[in-house]
Amino acid sequence: MSCQQSQQQCQPPPKCTPKCPPKCPTPKCPPKCPPKCPPVSSCCSVSSGGCCGSSSGGCCSSGGGGCCSSGGGGCCLSHHRRRRSHRHRPQSSDCCSQPSAGSSCCGGGSGQHSGGCC
């Protein structure tokens, strides 16, 4: 009996699980947080001048893929385009004041609201 008792005492103790989890190698937050992006509907693409405010009537990219005010009908391409020059020159495209699916501006004036697209 004494031999069995001594064998039980000589057994190694069970391994204990660590109380604290290991530390993560990366911090939870990045050192510099990027600015929050405004909604996509109120922004133009980065190449076309950034964001456009709701009160400014909107802005259009050179390819007509920008944004206009909610009352407008979208963007239409400007008439004067140079295809030979490979420079990324900002070309003025107008916003239509009437909903239409055209690619060129029609109507009077050469402002942001030129009557619609045709």
Swiss-Prot record:
Residues 1-10, 95-104 have a biased composition (Low complexity). Induction: By UVB. Residues 1-23, 82-118 are annotated as: Disordered. Residues 11-23 have a biased composition (Pro residues). Skin-specific. Expression was readily detected in adult trunk skin, adult arm skin, fetal skin, penal skin, vulva, esophagus and tongue. Not expressed in the cervix, rectum, lung, colon, or placenta. Expression is observed in the fibroblasts. It holds the Pfam family LCE. GO terms for biological process: keratinization. InterPro entries: LCE. Residues 105-118 have a biased composition (Gly residues). GO terms for molecular function: identical protein binding. Keywords: Keratinization. Belongs to the LCE family. Precursors of the cornified envelope of the stratum corneum. Belongs to the LCE cluster present on 1q21. This is Late cornified envelope protein 1F. The gene is LCE1F.
